[in-house]
Swiss-Prot record:
Protein name: Chorismate synthase
Pathway terms, separated by semicolons: Metabolic intermediate biosynthesis; chorismate biosynthesis; chorismate from D-erythrose 4-phosphate and phosphoenolpyruvate: step 7/7
Cofactor note: Reduced FMN (FMNH(2)).
A Pfam family that the UniProt record links to this protein: Chorismate_synt
Gene this chain is encoded by: aroC
Species of the source: Lachnoclostridium phytofermentans (strain ATCC 700394 / DSM 18823 / ISDg) (Clostridium phytofermentans)
Length: 367
């Protein structure tokens, strides 16, 4: 299977299946000397692991990371960093029935169409557990970005019809909400909405917003490797994502040029600033120094107990109700996955951008 790697300089390759012995990732291209330990990575993994709230799958996994290589005495060595997380509570028997039919909304049919074979146990490689490797790698990228004063903040913007405004939220409330929704009043309304979904044997989708601050102007490559194009690729590679927009996004189709253009000015300290941020912090595929803001639309969990129509391998039309342990909503656990992919994208482009000016090269190599 191709397509399991991401990045050009700061590169990752994930491996493993939902019900295999473990999930892992290899990170290549991380500079030597970055402070790193398993606890730092575990903090990220704990944000996505299952079974922590009533709104995530009851499958209990500790998701404990083991660093196998690339770190010595708390510092990265510059060699590939290999990490593994064991699958400890897989219940493959829950999935034996689905070997004979295609689950609506899943990749069962398309994997069969491409490979003529599929691992039906929890979706195999197409399972959401694949994102564990991304999150572990993203923790390393986030540590690198932190050294440069760059912060990636990601949260649940909406669940079903319940939507919040970032500017009216308090970041510290993020960990107080089981849904990663920093507006606690809205979070409670979203919980009530999810209770209705569960009662109706259904699931819900939602939206995740990411705000990246501290990115200097000049990051990203024009034409095919634009910063916004790379972010879109990264976020769309997450299985549950079905939509992506940056800045004002699809609203720009309704705006006039005079409304959409972001004016420039100098602040009291003589620093160039933008008066608005409809562009989402990117112009011409290159960061402009303001906050990078994007949103990802997450589809409802496809595994639901409500009866749905499908077909089996005997050529029959059938009705199915999906059994097993599944999230009524993917969004809260996907928040850190989106954050990880954003961090990986920025880390890769920052490192590749070091050769864009002769001044940068001289700072490193001139004697």
């Amino acid at each position: 299977m191709s397509g399991s790697s991401f990045g050009s300089i700061f590169k990752i390759a994930t491996w493993g299946e939902s019900h295999g012995k473990g999930i892992g990732v290899v990170v290549d291209g991380c500079p030597a000397g970055l402070t790193l330990n398993e606890e730092m990575i575990q903090t990220f993994l704990n944000r996505r692991k299952p079974g922590q709230t009533k709104y995530s799958t009851p499958r209990k996994e500790d998701d404990l990371v083991t660093i196998l290589s690339g770190v010595f005495e708390g510092k990265t060595t510059g060699t590939p960093i290999s990490m593994m997380i064991a699958n400890e509570t897989a219940r493959s028997a829950d999935y034996s029935e689905i070997a004979s039919f295609y689950r609506p909304g899943h990749a069962d049919y398309t994997f069969d169409a491409k490979y003529g074979f599929r691992d039906y146990r929890g979706g195999g490689r197409s399972s959401g557990r694949e994102t564990i490797g991304r999150v572990a790698a993203g923790a390393i990228a986030a540590a690198l970005l932190k050294e440069l004063g760059i912060e990636v903040f990601t949260y649940t913007k909406s669940i079903g019809p319940i939507q919040i405004d970032y500017h009216k939220c308090q970041k510290e409330n993020l960990t107080l909400s089981p849904l990663c929704m920093p507006d606690l009043e809205a979070s409670q309304k979203a919980e009530d909405y999810l209770e209705q979904c569960i009662h109706n044997l259904d699931s819900s989708g939602g939206m995740i917003e990411c705000i990246i601050s501290g990115v200097p102007a000049g990051i990203g490559e024009p034409v095919f490797d634009k910063l916004d194009a790379q972010l879109a690729k990264a976020i769309f590679s997450i299985g549950a994502v079905k939509g992506f927009e940056i800045g004002s996004g699809f609203e720009v189709a309704k705006q006039l040029g005079s409304e959409n253009n972001d004016g420039f000015a100098f602040d009291a300290n003589g620093k160039l600033i933008k008066l608005t941020n409809h562009s989402g912090g990117i112009l011409g595929g290159i960061s402009d120094g303001s906050e990078i803001i994007f949103r990802a639309a997450i589809k409802p969990t496809p595994s639901i107990k409500k009866e749905q129509q499908t077909v089996n391998k005997s050529g029959e039309n059938i009705n199915v109700s999906i059994k097993g342990r599944h999230d009524p909503i993917i969004v809260p656990r996907a928040v850190v996955v989106v954050e990880a992919m954003a961090a990986l994208t920025l880390a890769d482009l920052l490192l590749s951008g070091m050769s864009s000016k002769m001044d940068y090269v001289k700072k490193i190599y001139q004697k």
